[in-house]
Amino acid sequence: MLTLSDLQSLCHEAAGRISPHVRHTPVEYSHALSEVSGAEVYLKLENLQATGSFKIRGATNALLSLEAGATGVVAASSGNHGMAVAHAARVAGLYPLIFVPEGAATSKVEAIEALG
């Protein structure tokens, strides 16, 4: 069974692994949300990442954790996940193959192509 200490260790390892490859985004206090909720609300501005979302963190950690010898990665997405996998594959030195649904917005397809 995974203990809290084990989980903390795994999180610290992941943070160290991805740190050179992701932006260190700010945390900002939200007066409006704090007032509405009656609690102190802080926002982690992951929209400032290279891919525009937090998904770059998980994708980068996963691809940098692959066993030696991996040469590529496959994903299916027309959005943030596809962009994150394409970016992380480039960081990890892997070939990304991202399947995008027919009819996906051209801007999203171009963003994925630009990243990987």
Language-model-derived ranges and their functions:
Residues 1-116:
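PLP-dependent amino-acid enzyme catalytic core
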